[in-house]
């Protein structure tokens, strides 16, 4: 008798992706973040759908519609805070997932890696537009500041900004289109995730040693399904602890004041997950230079496969590269801290040094250290 799981056209795709998928026998907990990101996306789409049922994308009523959700809708407060803090969990998982790829050399699957970088951009765009929707002070100021950056593009900049705004300032048209884009983008992200997995399953997963593991594969189910369930439990535990005990921990108090174009918050800053990029943007005194540095700070990830000069794929057996990698992580923490500080001494110079170090490590120090390690191993 034939097994439906292996013959049915739809069930077969699921089977080859999540059940009978050959997986390396030694992948660690760092490989859990793919499934956790999938879960985060599902949580965000579902909570977002229920929020959209009660939200109005009009400047006059947006803020009060969010208040209405929190006060009058059954479990509206829970849905709203799960959505807001779910975004934070999404980015934590994203950063760890990307960091894992950098450490273990997963970027050598460059189709998978490049789709991943595009996904990162898409998620960042979605999060930015979502932050504008409650129409609080920081929503308004953030939308104004970030969209204004496009005016740095020579010749077409000003026209482009006014086109995105749908007027001469951030107003009703801007809010409505941001809501439309914020709704559609997660579904585009879901489609890109499919492509990401398609490319990944062409090659199979990498593993901590970076050595080809074709000779030693195990089925994904039950080994990694049970392992993923543990990750899911920990993620849900963290998310619900955040939502139920301190839902506003990662938010900005300014966003509890309705948007007022006539008064600007003293310190405009984005959500914590954009602070590192915001610090890089602010550390360059020139507007266009800052915008380019901001874009390149993420786009630089696409250069990783080209900058890989080591004879070994993973950093597992490369202590010097490990050192440099963890300095890069510390540097990103420093940038995140600086992004949340006011623009004054000594934060300005710390931010500039941290920004220079960020690009130097990726473009110069890591490749150089890789070559030194090759020499030490007489390769």
Swiss-Prot record:
Cofactor binding, note field: Binds 2 heme b groups non-covalently.
Cellular localization per UniProt: Mitochondrion inner membrane
GO MF, one example: ubiquinol-cytochrome-c reductase activity
GO biological process, one term: mitochondrial electron transport, ubiquinol to cytochrome c
Cofactor: heme b
InterPro entries: Cyt_b/b6_C, Cyt_b/b6_C_sf, Cyt_b/b6_N, Cytb/b6-like_sf, Cytochrome_b, Cytochrome_b_C_euk/bac, Cytochrome_b_N_euk/bac, Di-haem_cyt_TM
Positions that bind heme b b562: 83, 182
Membrane topology: Multi-pass membrane protein
Keyword Mitochondrion: yes
Subunit structure: The cytochrome bc1 complex contains 11 subunits: 3 respiratory subunits (MT-CYB, CYC1 and UQCRFS1), 2 core proteins (UQCRC1 and UQCRC2) and 6 low-molecular weight proteins (UQCRH/QCR6, UQCRB/QCR7, UQCRQ/QCR8, UQCR10/QCR9, UQCR11/QCR10 and a cleavage product of UQCRFS1). This cytochrome bc1 complex then forms a dimer.
Functional summary from the UniProt entry: Component of the ubiquinol-cytochrome c reductase complex (complex III or cytochrome b-c1 complex) that is part of the mitochondrial respiratory chain. The b-c1 complex mediates electron transfer from ubiquinol to cytochrome c. Contributes to the generation of a proton gradient across the mitochondrial membrane that is then used for ATP synthesis.
Family assignment from sequence similarity: Belongs to the cytochrome b family.
The protein, known as: Cytochrome b
Source species taxonomy: Eukaryota, Metazoa, Chordata, Craniata, Vertebrata
């Amino acid at each position: 008798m034939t097994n439906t799981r292996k013959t049915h056209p739809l069930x077969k795709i699921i089977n080859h992706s999540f059940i009978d998928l050959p997986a390396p026998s030694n992948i660690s907990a760092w490989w859990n973040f793919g499934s956790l990101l999938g879960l985060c996306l599902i949580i965000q789409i579902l909570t977002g759908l229920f929020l959209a049922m009660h939200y109005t994308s009009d400047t006059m009523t947006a803020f009060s519609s969010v208040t209405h959700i929190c006060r009058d809708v059954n479990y509206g407060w829970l849905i709203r805070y799960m959505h807001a803090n779910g975004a934070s969990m999404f980015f934590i998982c994203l950063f760890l997932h990307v960091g894992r790829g950098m450490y273990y050399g997963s970027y050598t699957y460059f189709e998978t890696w490049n789709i991943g970088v595009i996904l990162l951009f898409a998620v960042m765009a979605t999060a930015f537009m979502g932050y504008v929707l409650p129409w609080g002070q920081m929503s308004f100021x953030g939308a104004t500041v970030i969209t204004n950056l496009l005016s740095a593009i020579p010749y077409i900049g000003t026209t482009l900004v006014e086109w995105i705004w749908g007027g001469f300032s951030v107003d009703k048209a801007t809010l409505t289109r941001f809501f439309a884009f914020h709704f559609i983008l997660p579904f585009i992200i879901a489609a890109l995730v499919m492509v990401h997995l398609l490319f990944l399953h062409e090659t199979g997963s990498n593993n901590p040693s970076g050595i080809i593991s074709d000779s030693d594969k195990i089925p994904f189910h039950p080994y990694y399904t049970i392992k993923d369930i543990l990750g899911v439990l920990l993620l849900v535990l963290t998310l619900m602890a955040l939502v139920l005990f301190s839902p506003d921990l990662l938010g900005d108090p300014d966003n509890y004041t309705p948007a007022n174009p006539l008064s600007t918050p003293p310190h405009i800053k984005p959500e914590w997950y954009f602070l590192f990029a915001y610090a890089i943007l602010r550390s360059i005194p020139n507007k266009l230079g800052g915008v380019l540095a901001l874009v390149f700070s993420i786009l630089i990830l696409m250069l990783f496969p080209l900058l890989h000069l080591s004879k070994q794929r993973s950093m597992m057996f490369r202590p010097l590269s490990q050192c440099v990698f963890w300095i890069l992580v510390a540097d990103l923490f420093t940038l995140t801290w600086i992004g949340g500080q006011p623009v004054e001494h000594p934060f300005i110079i710390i931010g500039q040094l941290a920004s220079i170090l960020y690009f130097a490590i990726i473009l110069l120090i890591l490749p150089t250290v890789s070559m030194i390690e090759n020499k030490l191993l007489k390769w």
